[in-house]
Design a protein with these regions (language model features):
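Glycine-enriched alpha-helix->loop->beta-strand junction motifs that scaffold or abut catalytic
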Residues: 38-40, 92-97
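Conserved small/polar residues in nucleotide/adenosyl-binding loops
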Residues: 123-125
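Active-site beta-loop-alpha junctions enriched in small/polar residues
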Residues: 23-25, 47-49, 79-83, 103-105
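Active-site-adjacent beta->alpha loops and helix N-cap segments on the catalytic face
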Residues: 52-60, 82-85, 104-120
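Glycine-rich, positively charged N-terminal anion/phosphate-binding segment
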Residues: 3-4, 25-70
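Hydrophobic faces of well-ordered beta-strands that scaffold small-molecule active sites
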Residues: 17-21, 42-45, 74-79, 98-100
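N-terminal amphipathic alpha-helix/helix-capping segment at the start of soluble metabolic enzymes
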Residues: 1-18
C-alpha cells in the first residue's frame, strides 16, 4: 500500500503514525519495541548521515526485517535528503517516501530540484 493510502487509512481509523529517525540497530529496536507495545504504525526515517553510517542496503534490510519481526505497519522515508542523487538511490532501494531539502539553494534551484524529486517519486512510488 502506498504511503498516501496508508495515511488516509490511518486517518479514517483515527490513528497517528509515528515518524522518527533511526541511526543504528539500537535506536531502530527501541522505536520498534515502543510502536509494538501500542500497536502503532511507524514511518522509519533515515538521513544521509545515518545512511552513510550504516550503509543504504543494510539500513533498508534492518528496517524491513524489523517491521516484519514486530508485525508492524510502516514504511521507510528519506528525511531531509540533500541531493537528487541520494533521493534516486533511496527510491531504487525501495523507500516509500522521500523528502528533499534544497533550502540552501536559490529559490529557482530549489524549485528545479524539488520538481526533479517529484518526477522521480512519481515513477517509483
Amino acid at each position: 500500500m502506498k504511503v498516501q493510502e496508508k495515511l488516509k487509512q490511518f486517518q479514517l481509523e483515527r490513528k497517528a503514525i509515528l515518524a522518527t529517525n533511526f541511526y543504528n540497530y539500537e535506536t531502530l529496536k527501541g522505536i520498534l519495541e515502543a510502536a509494538s507495545r501500542v500497536q502503532a504504525p511507524v514511518m522509519l526515517q533515515l538521513t544521509r548521515s545515518s545512511i552513510d553510517y550504516m550503509g543504504l542496503k543494510r539500513a533498508v534490510v534492518l528496517a524491513r526485517q524489523g517491521l516484519e519481526d514486530y508485525r508492524l505497519d510502516g514504511c521507510i522515508h528519506l528525511d531531509h535528503g540533500g541531493s537528487v542523487e541520494l533521493v534516486q538511490r533511496c527510491l531504487d532501494a525501495g523507500f516509500e517516501s522521500v523528502m528533499i531539502d534544497a533550502s540552501e539553494k536559490s529559490m529557482e534551484e530549489n524549485i528545479e530540484t524539488t520538481c526533479k524529486v517529484v518526477e522521480l517519486s512519481l515513477i517509483h512510488i
